């Protein structure tokens, strides 16, 4: 909630904030749209409002997602590529991206960001494909299952390593 976030920022007095918190599952965003939008966008605007009124010197980093471009036909996406969100998750990330640009420009806040493409980490839950594969292979190896079921495998997606993105 915004009050708690603002109290923490006020107490800690950071020089920099790196915000990696949000609801990050595209499928879930369709099931719980208000929660997804609130945690991904409204919470960020609450932080921006705090920075605007209390401490414009804090440097702020906000990642967003390539999902905000939707199923683009472009071979190479750029910051000025057309936004075409196709899920609540992508809509929330698009809104956060635009809010970051607006607060930076209009209110002279130090806000920078990065457009992240798909990335994986050991912390991912078993619902994500790389963890499904790892868990499935382990289950087959240990005799718990006879085959690996993935579902739709038509997607063409590149992945990066989350730690590399953060560094």
Positions of predicted regions on the chain:
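N-terminal Rossmann-like NAD(P)+-binding domain of SDR-like oxidoreductases, especially those catalyzing
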Residues: 1-119
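NAD(P)-dependent short-chain dehydrogenase/reductase
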Residues: 74-75, 98-166
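Acidic-enriched, low-complexity/disordered segments with a strong bias for Aspartate over Glutamate
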Residues: 1, 10, 15, 22-24, ...
């Amino acid at each position: 909630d915004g009050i708690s976030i603002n109290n923490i920022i006020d107490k800690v007095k950071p020089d920099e904030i790196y915000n990696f918190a949000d609801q990050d599952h595209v499928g879930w965003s369709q099931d719980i749209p208000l929660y997804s939008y609130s945690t991904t966008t409204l919470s960020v605007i609450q932080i921006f409002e705090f920075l605007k009124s209390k401490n414009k010197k804090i440097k702020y980093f906000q990642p967003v997602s390539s999902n905000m471009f939707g199923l683009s036909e472009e071979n190479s996406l750029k910051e000025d590529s057309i936004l075409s969100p196709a899920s609540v998750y992508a809509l929330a990330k698009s809104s956060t991206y635009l809010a970051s640009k607006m607060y930076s420009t209009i209110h002279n806040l130090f806000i920078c960001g990065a457009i992240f493409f798909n990335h994986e980490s050991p912390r991912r839950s078993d619902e994500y494909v790389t963890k499904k594969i790892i868990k499935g292979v382990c289950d087959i190896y240990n005799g718990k299952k006879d085959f690996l079921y993935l579902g739709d495998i038509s997607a063409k997606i590149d992945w990066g390593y989350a730690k590399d993105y953060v560094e």
